[in-house]
Every structure is written in C-alpha cells, then in structure tokens.
Amino acid sequence: MNIQALLSEKVRQAMIAAGAPADCEPQVRQSAKVQFGDYQANGMMAVAKKLGMAPRQLAEQVLTHLDLNGIASKVEIAGPGFINIFLDPAFLADHVQQALASDRLDVATPEKQTIVVDYSAPNVAKEMHVGHLRSTIIGDAAVRTLEFLGHKVIRANHVGDWGTQFGMLIAWLEKQQQENAGEMELADLEGFYRDAKKHYDEDEEFAERARNYVVKLQSGDEYFREMWRKLVDITMTQNQITYDRLNVTLTRDDVMGESLYNPMLLGIVADLKAKGLAVESEGATVVFLDEFKNKEGEPMGVIIQKKDGGYLYTTTDIACAKYRYETLHADRVLYYIDSRQHQHLMQAWAIVRKAGYVPESVPLEHHMFGMMLGKDGKPFKTRAGGTVKLADLLDEALERARRLVAEKNPDMPADELEKLANAVGIGAVKYADLSKNRTTDYIFDWDNMLAFEGNTAPYMQYAYTRVLSVFRKAEINEEQLAAAPVIIREDREAQLAARLLQFEETLTVVAREGTPHVMCAYLYDLAGLFSGFYEHCPILSAENEEVRNSRLKLAQLTAKTLKLGLDTLGIETVERM
C-alpha cells in the first residue's frame, strides 16, 4: 500500500479540475509534525504562480474537487496554501488488516525490470579490506530491496582479475616452486604480492619474464590460464567466507571480472575509430569529450588505448556497460563505486552514449559513497597506519559483541551466546554504515555502533525482541487474533498505524535512490513510535478483549515490519536478547 502515491494522484486530479496543467506536481509529502496531519500537499505554490493566482485561492479551489472520502477524516489549508491531510482511522484500520493478511505486508510489485547492480569488486590476490565494506553492504541492501519489490536483479561483482600484475604473480609463484597455488591461503598471497612487486621493481630480468607471461596469459596459453584461474579461485574462496560472515547475498556465480570484457576491447577501439569518435593522438588512441574540459578549457582527451597497445580501465568500463545492455538486457544499471571514481565513470558513459552502445532510456547510475574515517577524521587505519583487513574488523566486532552480550546474559549457554554475538557484532558494523547517508564520509566508532541507545543495530534488534515478548506474555490464539478487528481510537494508535503503512513508500525511495539510510531512519522512527504506543496504550491490560486484540495486531504488524525492513538491510534479527 503506497498512500503517498494514492494521495498524489487524487490531489493531482483535483488540481487539474481546478485549472492546473496536466503535468502539475502535487508534491505530497509525509508531514514532519503531527499537527500538520499525516501528509501535506505542497504543490500549490509553484502552480499558483504559473496561473497568476494566490496559492491559498488555488488550494481552496482544489479542495472543492478533492474527493478523499473513506481515506481522510479531515483536510485543511494551512499557511500560504499547504493542504494538510489527516487519514481516517477506519482507513488505517482496514489497511493494517490487509498488511497483516499478506506475506509481503501488502507491498505492491512495480513493473518488473532487469536491474544490474555492480558492487563489492575486490581485487584478485589481495585480501578484502575496509575500503570494500561500503560498496559490498550498501550494494547488497539495494539488491535485497529491488528483489523484494519483484525485479530481476543481476549481481555483478566486477573483480579486478586482469592486468600486468598477473604476469608478475605467476612468475613469482613459479620462481618459488609454488605452482600448486590451490593449497595456498590468501594470507600467503598477500605476502607473495608484496614480494613479487619488490622483485618486479628491483630485478629487470624478473620483470621481463613477468611481462612475457602477461603476453602469454593474454594470448590464451593454457598453462598460464590455469595458474591465473588458481589465483582467482583462491581469492574468491576466501572472499566468500567474508561475504557469508557479512550476511551478503553475493556468490561465486556473481563474479563478472575485468577479464570477461577483455575479448571485446580490440573491437570497441576499432568501432570507436570507425565512428569517428576515437583518434590517434601522440601514438595513443583518444576520445575527445566536449563535456569535459582540461585546464586550458579545451575538450578533454580520454585515452582508450596506450601507445604500447595496452587498454585502460575506461576501455573496460565502456565494454562493461555495452555488455550489460546488449547481453544481460539491463533496463537499469547501478554502480556502487566510491565518489573518487565519478569523473572516470562519467567519461566512460559519455563515450558509451555517443557510440550508441546503451540508449538514453537505460539509466546508468553512479550510486557513489564517501569514505570510512577513524575518530581522528582521517581514513580508517590500523594503529600502525596500515590498511585494516575486513576479516580482522569482523573478528573484532564479534569479540566486542561477545563481551557485551555475556555481560548482559551471564547465564546464557555458549552456543546461544555465540549466535547472538554474531548477529549483534556483524549487525552493528553493517547498520552503522547503512544508517548514514552514503554520499557522505562517516566516523567509524565502536562505542556508538554497539550502543543499545540511538539509531544502532543493537537498539533495533532489541526493539524487535521487545515486541515479540508481548506475544510470549499474551499466550494468544493465532486464529482468534486473525479474526479480530483492528479498532483505532487513540492518537498513538493512529500515529503507529500510519507509520506502519509507510513501509512501501520507504522501500520505493531506497529502490529509486539506493539510500538504505532512509530505511534505517524509518525503522528507528517506527521503533520509537511503538515504544510510545506501548507506554500509553496498555496491550495486555487493555480495558477489554476487543481493544487488547486490536493493539496486539498493531504490535504484530510492527514486529513483521521491523523484521522485513531489517532483512532488506541484511541485518539479522534475534528472538531474545
């Protein structure tokens, strides 16, 4: 149920009947304050200006055409021409019943699209670090939301599995007589990478061999392809452990690395030349883009093939966008890549559009994000100033959560404690990130994220168990409760019901904007409203059974909404804390 969409259409029709143009925007928003109703239509100002009349006068005319019978109990004009809409308690009660009767909480399915989501993208032969966290968990929250809404989602894990470093790594493995790379741990590979790089920089003979190996690998030599595959396999096996720990839905089947697009690059460069988009410049192949200017104010040159014949990330990204449209048949492509890559992506996509590889009707969206910072406001590092490995971060989260949970539950059995600590620790790390607007940097703070107060995972998980505890105490008959009516008489009942029915609107925003923090804010607000409702509207000690059952149903929908909302974020719920 999308009340905002329903009201928007009703108000728009009334505005048109009052003389507004057919493309008018009613601007229906959820009201920020209770005294302004549940929703507010703010579109009169802009339209009245076009019509040359006072906004309040237009609002009055709109009201004469606005039929919200059975939806709103009161509609009033406020200030210069805002229309405040107060939802009818009977309407709320009816839709609470409908939500409870549906596995999907009465959330509609929009027109199905094929949506490719590019996220995580670690590098082969390197362990995942904290820099991969945001892309991985924000992208996964978007994927979960889009799938819940009924879209066909293709996860694309654009791993860095190609390039000159593979010649270097294979040469070093060979030199160490470690050809059976399958038995190596990734921790060894980290050291191998450093040692290989050191030799590559210092030993010209070794570097020459590494360069030859790259050529052999790229020409498809089976021995080198097999060594390369081992490196990829070791890395992705290790990464899968991290994905599983993070409760992220990526699997090995979702890997679409840079190597996938390599066979396309020669043809793309030739095609861009044939179309007159790419030209030779100082030995390299370049596309000049009028949309981007260099320091001299001239069109910026984007290199797609170097003098030595090598390709660049831009070339791969052009091929990648083309593949996602032509082969995967994407209707929409989302990229969860940090904000520093924005210009690079915009340039690649400008070339993609000019070449006609992806039509304008298919959005290519950069859902960029800021950095994770330490308390000092600088990029998050180890005490020694090194990069924090993601596995180490999750180990620490688990250890801190274990202490926290044991403190609160000294008699809890060990296996139960471990399960709870895992849900709380991993949930805390994820929720701390997801609850911040992705476009900004954020401070990583253990104390804040593991607190049981405020907009945190432990608070949300506890809020869920608190609602469940009502049912444990109530000893309800499920069939009896299902048949009982919902009756809304108190303001706090109405406020909670209205917020519960805004779940679909919240999902719609997350699906459109790729902003999981909107869901976090909604769930936190919902938990707060339930707390106020629980305090002021007795459930188990209600004045009669009818009121008791009605309030139990509001509690039931709260529990279902919290669980489903947290699930779209990839945050695990628990039955007891």
UniProtKB/Swiss-Prot annotation:
SUPFAM superfamilies recorded: Anticodon-binding domain of a subclass of class I aminoacyl-tRNA synthetases, Arginyl-tRNA synthetase (ArgRS), N-terminal 'additional' domain, Nucleotidylyl transferase
List the Gene Ontology MF annotations in alphabetical order. Answer: arginine-tRNA ligase activity; ATP binding
Q: Which UniProt keywords apply?
A: Aminoacyl-tRNA synthetase, ATP-binding, Cytoplasm, Ligase, Nucleotide-binding, Protein biosynthesis
Specify the signal sequence span. Answer: none
Q: Name one GO cellular component term.
A: cytoplasm
Catalyses: tRNA(Arg) + L-arginine + ATP = L-arginyl-tRNA(Arg) + AMP + diphosphate
- InterPro entries attached here? aa-tRNA-synth_I_CS, Arg-tRNA-ligase, Arg-tRNA-synth_N, Arg-tRNA-synth_N_sf, ArgRS_core, DALR_anticod-bd, Rossmann-like_a/b/a_fold, tRNAsynth_Ia_anticodon-bd
Which family, according to UniProt?
A: Belongs to the class-I aminoacyl-tRNA synthetase family.
Q: What is this protein called?
A: Arginine--tRNA ligase
Lineage of origin: Bacteria, Pseudomonadati, Pseudomonadota, Gammaproteobacteria, Enterobacterales
